[in-house]
Design a protein with these regions (language model features):
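Residue(s) in the substrate-gating loop at a strand-loop-helix junction
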Residues: 144
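Active-site helix of classical SDR
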Residues: 124, 160, 168
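Conserved mid-core segment of classical short-chain dehydrogenase/reductases
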Residues: 72, 95-110, 133, 153-156, ...
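Alpha-helical segment proximal to the catalytic Tyr-Lys
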Residues: 129, 173-177, 237
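Catalytic Tyr-X3-Lys loop
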Residues: 102-122, 136, 140, 164, ...
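Conserved glycine-rich cofactor-binding loop
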Residues: 9, 16-17
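C-terminal substrate-recognition "lid" of short-chain dehydrogenase/reductases
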Residues: 136, 217-246
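Conserved glycine-rich Rossmann-like NAD(P)H-binding loop of the short-chain dehydrogenase/reductase
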Residues: 32-46
Length: 250
């Protein structure tokens, strides 16, 4: 693997599973030093062990990104330990099973807004502070195809992820003269751990959904990780404020 990111420091939220974990692995393969956050210490250790197998290293910090002070503490550590931050992938997110909007509870609304939007904004605030110190940075936010395509039972999730797209398209102007780009990715249906479990427990539904997708299959987490790294590459320096769908044609 080309070590194109050797010497670069990267931060990933939600790095203990799914798209975040795949992004940590891809960055390590490309030579970056990675700090990732999450809430599951056992899963984090598995990620760290895998990174060592890949010939790199990653550091983990337990962090609830919905608490701004927790986020401040993590980025204080990054500043002290590394003195800079080159890349940031704000991947952490949550959802609920398909739920009609009038059946959605207050707790569900709070959870999705707090994690998907407020937590992401807290991370961006601290990322930008460090990046401005060195007039360089690449930020990628994970939104969702739900923000762009209507579907039943997805209203609150879509609202939180549409907020991510909105933050991306506007925050990019605040930092564009500081050498910082801000872009987002809207994944379609991706075969995360949750989808893999459905693959076996609801095989017919899984097969039907896959066949109805334009490309005929679910996406893989690695394909989203490749998209994140695309925005981190030097060749993408002129791209900012873009929301890139990676959704197999949806």
């Amino acid at each position: 693997m080309n070590k194109q990111f050797e010497g670069k420091v990267a931060f990933i939220s939600g790095g203990t599973s799914g798209l975040g974990k795949a992004t940590v692995y891809e960055l390590v393969k490309r030579g970056a030093r990675v700090i990732f956050v999450g809430r599951d210490d056992a899963k984090a250790q598995e990620v760290i062990n895998k990174c060592k197998e890949l010939g790199g290293e990653a550091e983990y910090k337990n962090c609830d990104i919905t608490k701004h002070q927790n986020v401040i503490d993590v980025f204080g550590y990054i500043r002290e330990r590394y003195g800079k931050l080159d890349f940031a992938g704000n991947v952490a997110g949550t959802g609920i099973p398909s739920t009609q909007i009038d059946d959605t509870t207050d707790d569900q609304i709070d959870m999705m807004i707090d994690i998907n939007l407020k937590g992401l904004i807290y991370c961006m605030i601290e990322e930008i502070k460090i990046m401005r110190e060195h007039s360089f940075g690449r930020i990628v936010n994970i939104a969702s195809g739900a923000a762009n395509i209507g579907a039943p039972g997805m209203a609150v999730l879509a609202a939180s992820k549409a907020g991510v797209v909105g933050v991306t398209k506007n925050a990019c102007f605040d930092v564009v003269r500081d050498g910082i780009t801000v872009n987002s990715i809207s994944p379609g249906a991706i075969e995360t751990e949750l989808v893999q479990s459905i693959k076996y427990t609801h095989a017919e539904e899984y097969k039907s959904y896959s066949n109805n997708m334009p490309i005929g299959r679910f996406g893989m987490p690695e394909e989203i990780a490749h998209g994140v790294c695309f925005f981190f590459e030097d060749e993408s320096a002129f791209i900012t404020g873009v929301n890139l769908p990676i959704d197999g044609g949806f």
